[in-house]
Amino acid sequence: LNRLIREDNKTFGKTWLYSYDNKGNILCKRETAFTLKENVEESEFESVQYEYDGDNLLAYGTEACEYDAIGNPKTYRGKSVSWSNGRQMVSYNTTAFTYDGLGRRLSKGTINYTYDGNNRIIKQSNGLEFIYDNSGVAGIVYNGTTYVYRKDGQGNICALIDSNGNVVVQYKYDAWGNHAALYLNKVNDK
């Protein structure tokens, strides 16, 4: 059924096992220290259980999930979430979000966004600027220094490189493509 049932991730020092219901929803995620052993003792695992009602996730581990009438989450990681105009998040905990008539996010808390003619964010009010190529975001300019992204075969950003070719940030992902780790070197903060 092409479902991920085991991930042995040496980078993170973890092995994860997954089980699913007949709809393909994850029922249980079990975690232990990295191992390549075929059979691992059940007592070595920490487990997170998932509970569903139809298409909605009701709970995972100790976190309960609640949704509005169209399926937007009302809470995330114990913090409240508010929505407007369908799927536009207008607040998360104490952070407010604003949008323009085209549905583009104009602000997130105190950070404002500037768009180009292709509806791409090119600048944030905190001084961060974005560089694009034909495949999307290619890098950033921060405090006058240009950094470019190195991407892996799936298009995930795996490193941020300064103008001298130094790796200043490395990103690592799990088998699902979720960003799972960040390794920082000194960033030029003029």
Feature-to-residue mapping (PLM):
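Generic structural signal for coil-to-beta-strand starts
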Residues: 3, 23-25, 70-72, 88, ...
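Beta-strand-dense domains in secreted/periplasmic systems and polymorphic toxin scaffolds
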Residues: 4-8, 26-29, 43, 60-61, ...
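A residue-level detector for well-ordered beta-strand positions
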Residues: 18, 48-50, 64-65, 81, ...
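Short, acidic, Ser/Thr-enriched surface-loop or helix-capping motifs
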Residues: 21, 52, 68, 83-86, ...
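A motif-centric feature for acidic-aromatic and gly/ser/thr-rich catalytic loops and repeats
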Residues: 34-51, 144-190
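Extracellular, surface-exposed repeat architectures
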Residues: 53-58
